[in-house]
Swiss-Prot record:
GO MF entries: ATP binding; proton-transporting ATP synthase activity, rotational mechanism
Protein name, per record: ATP synthase epsilon chain
Compartment(s) where it occurs, according to its Swiss-Prot or TrEMBL record: Cellular thylakoid membrane
Function: Produces ATP from ADP in the presence of a proton gradient across the membrane.
Pfam family, one: ATP-synt_DE_N
Top-level taxon of the source organism: Bacteria
NCBIfam families found in the cross-reference section: ATP_synt_epsi
Subunit structure: F-type ATPases have 2 components, CF(1) - the catalytic core - and CF(0) - the membrane proton channel. CF(1) has five subunits: alpha(3), beta(3), gamma(1), delta(1), epsilon(1). CF(0) has three main subunits: a, b and c.
InterPro entries linked: ATP_synth_F1_dsu/esu (IPR001469), ATP_synth_F1_dsu/esu_N (IPR020546), ATPsynth_dsu/esu_N (IPR036771)
Topology versus the membrane: Peripheral membrane protein
Record's GO cellular component terms: plasma membrane-derived thylakoid membrane; proton-transporting ATP synthase complex
Keywords: ATP synthesis, CF(1), Hydrogen ion transport, Ion transport, Membrane, Thylakoid, Transport
């Protein structure tokens, strides 16, 4: 028994295949999905989706969206997604360091659109870096 996983972004079908287990980065924490899971709809945070299939793990960086689980089918609709195996680890690390520097430079300043955008960029850079490092 296995799951069918589909990860869809507006510009591409990121993943469409079978999975033994899926770990989703929901807005309330990591959510593990196995065959036979109850139906649910959840918000997806910026983070890394992990897929166990064929004895190995794959990672996908997600940039927020929604996931639906129904009858062993997991459908993830996201704003943007990237397979961990296609992300250059050195570039992802450099982007993370750059985003960290920007956020650190804004610390202590009042809330502003610039500060929110910088934090979003940091979260996205972190997800890409983690997905690149955990790709098999």
């Amino acid at each position: 028994m296995s799951l069918t996983l589909r990860v869809l972004a507006p510009d591409q079908n990121v993943f469409d295949g079978s999975a033994d287990e899926v770990i989703l980065p929901s807005t309330t924490g990591q959510l593990g999905i196995l065959p036979g899971h109850i139906s649910l709809l959840t918000a997806i945070d910026v983070g890394v989706l992990r897929v166990r299939a064929n004895g190995g793990w794959n990672s996908i960086a997600l940039m927020g969206g929604f996931a639906e689980v129904d009858a062993d089918e997991v459908t993830v609709l996201v704003n943007q997604a990237e397979l961990g195996s296609t992300i250059d680890g050195n570039t992802a690390e450099a982007d993370f360091q750059k985003a960290t520097t920007v956020v650190d430079g804004l610390e202590g300043q009042p809330a502003s659109p610039e500060k929110v955008k910088a934090q979003q960029q940091l979260n996205m850079a972190r997800a890409r870096m983690q997905a690149s490092k955990s790709a098999d």
